[in-house]
Curated annotation (Swiss-Prot):
It comes from Streptococcus pyogenes serotype M4 (strain MGAS10750). Gene3D superfamilies: Mur ligase, C-terminal domain (3.90.190.20), Mur-like, catalytic domain (3.40.1190.10), MurE/MurF, N-terminal domain (3.40.1390.10). The keyword Nucleus does not apply. This is UDP-N-acetylmuramoyl-L-alanyl-D-glutamate--L-lysine ligase. It holds the Pfam family Mur_ligase_C. The lineage of its organism: Bacteria, Bacillati, Bacillota, Bacilli, Lactobacillales. The gene is murE.
């Protein structure tokens, strides 16, 4: 429960309070109301709900529906003049985060918080950290792929970083379940729209940066994207940073006065020997590590997670065991066809991650290589040119372009746009299952491989704003083995 007096105090301390308006006029103080629930969904309110009117597309009709259901007061940046009191604020998203934090009893203070950011690798690094910490603690995890609040039950996440009301409700449930640590993926969008406003992490990890999520409904420029990624560093007590990433020198200057540790080529924490399923490291994680996920970049993700978990209480033995146990749905999953050709299923969904995926496969498979690829509709339009650029740099690759969450766009138009950036013929088969079946039929020898990129473990396609059932890349590939 939270009282009107408590929430006004929170807003005033954050300099985010304008006034309370009701039929009697302007009020600096207000009293007599308390709330047992928080919501931003007008369909889920009653007389004991504190409602947040948020979003550029919010309509007064939503508020009228809530009032019909008994709503007594709402928080908003706008007075909709509907006859009930309104708490006016300058920034509704910041208000949501701080009020949710207090409403749920500040659960962030009862958990050790570990956050990963980066253009790619967040989910893999989070899984590594989860398995490391699980050896001696009770970690919860909020991940793009899966979320667990109790270490037993896993469910699919809707957002990389949940909305603040949901985030703190989930944190509170983690505390109730006896969890000791929370591992989170924190997207640039989470900072852009203040989902984690006011939250300080015990350790923040910056894995890498490359142009992505740049478009009309995401970040207008790379500078804006990079800036919002860096906010995790400002909001972490200690940081772990990849010294091999672009713009590392800037980040090193930024965190000079913070507790920090670097890994990668310009640091003391490096991978010295790398094999397909093992690596040796020097520095704070010195030793031998077995790993199920192939690729040097996955080994670096394991290093990043290990350095973070070391600070959070994990032992080197915990880290070694955790790395050896980690598998990630839809990340570098490998199948073998009856003719011994390989099928690789991976979530690679931007130019940089595609380049790394192709390089790893080419290192191990020297025959015919078939790539199945698409790009999502109505988001991340810059990826299409990036995909074309990467494919152009791999001339021995045979490419079939297909649907990958086309949303409100025509998947063939998206494929044609990708193809326009490739200086050789490619095939377009918009039906993703047919594309996979054809590619697999063309691989006949053990040295051949099919690479299915983009969707990973997703068992749906996003079409016209809706999730449409799709068997999933791994299930389809398994069917045609």
């Amino acid at each position: 429960m939270i009282t009107i007096e408590q929430l006004l105090d929170i807003l005033k301390k954050d300099h985010n309070f304008r006034e309370v308006l009701d039929s009697d006029g302007y009020h600096y103080h207000y009293q007599g109301l308390s709330f047992e629930r928080l919501s931003y969904d007008s369909r889920q309110v009653d007389g004991k709900t504190l409602f947040f009117a948020k979003g550029a597309t919010f309509k007064a009709d939503y508020l009228k529906e809530a009032i019909t259901n008994g709503l007594q007061l709402y928080i908003s940046e706008v007075d909709y003049e509907l006859g009930i009191p309104v708490v006016l604020v300058t920034d509704i998203k910041k208000a949501m985060s701080l009020i949710a934090m207090a409403f749920y009893g500040n659960p962030q203070e009862k958990l050790k918080l570990l956050a990963f950011t980066g253009t790619k690798g967040k989910t893999t690094a989070a899984y590594f950290a989860y398995h490391m910490l699980k050896e001696s603690y009770k970690p919860a995890m909020f991940s793009t792929m899966n979320t667990t609040l109790d270490g037993k039950t896993f469910f699919k996440s809707q957002l990389t970083t949940p909305e603040s009301l949901d985030l703190f409700a989930m944190m509170a449930e983690c505390v109730t379940n006896g969890m000791t640590h929370l591992i989170m993926e924190v997207s640039s969008q989470a900072y852009l729209v203040d989902r984690v406003y006011g939250l300080t992490f015990d350790v923040g990890v910056f894995l890498n940066i490359s142009p992505d999520h740049i478009g009309p409904i995401e970040h207008p420029t790379f500078e804006d994207y990079f800036y919002h990624k860096r906010l995790l560093m400002e909001n972490s007590r200690a940081v772990v940073i990849n010294s091999g990433m672009d713009h590392f020198s800037f980040l090193a200057d930024q965190v000079a006065d913070q507790e920090h540790v670097f890994y990668g080529p310009l640091s003391d924490n490096q991978i010295t020997t790398s094999q397909a399923f093992s690596f040796e490291a020097k520095g704070q994680l010195a030793g031998h590590y077995d790993i199920q996920l192939i690729g040097h970049f996955n080994q670096e993700n394991a290093m990043a997670a290990g350095l973070a978990c070391l600070r959070l209480g994990a032992s080197l033995a915990d880290i070694q065991k955790g790395i050896a146990k980690t598998r990630v749905p839809g990340r570098m999953e490998v199948l073998t066809m009856t003719n011994h050709a390989k099928v690789f299923v991976d979530y690679a969904h931007n130019g940089d991650s595609l380049e790394k995926l192709l390089s790893v496969v080419e290192e191990h498979q020297t025959g015919k290589l078939m790539l199945i690829l698409g790009a999502p509709g109505n988001k991340g339009e810059s990826r299409r040119a990036d995909f074309g650029r990467v494919i152009h740099q791999h001339p021995n690759l045979t490419v079939i372009l297909t649907a990958d969450d086309p949303n409100f766009e025509d998947p063939e138009d998206i494929s044609q746009e990708i193809a326009s950036h490739i200086a050789r013929p490619v095939e377009i088969i918009s039906d993703r299952e047919q594309a996979i079946q054809k590619a697999m039929s063309l691989c006949q020898e053990a040295k051949d491989a099919v690479i299915i990129a983009g969707k990973g473990a997703d068992a749906y396609q996003i079409v016209k704003g809706q999730q449409v059932a799709y068997a999933g890349d791994l299930a389809i590939a398994t069917h045609y083995l």
